[in-house]
């Protein structure tokens, strides 16, 4: 849960994003990560579950600023950068 919170906060601090992921968006990420883990036959979520669904869940939930649009940057590109910048917790269980 802390990892999802850190990712959501990072979208609000990213200079190319005008409006980042909301608390409700973070809940959607958490729910989808749980569903992804279930489909992988696990009853727990690992960071890779969050990373696997993050772009799909969040791309339509952010609003890019004009600089990003002028630079022809897509939401997925910026969210990929956010994933790289936020430290992932240890997935060992």
Residue ranges and their predicted role:
Residues 2, 11-93:
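C-terminal engagement/docking regions of AAA+ P-loop ATPases
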Residues 5:
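Oxyanion-binding "anion nests"
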Residues 8:
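Alpha-helical substrate-binding/gating segment
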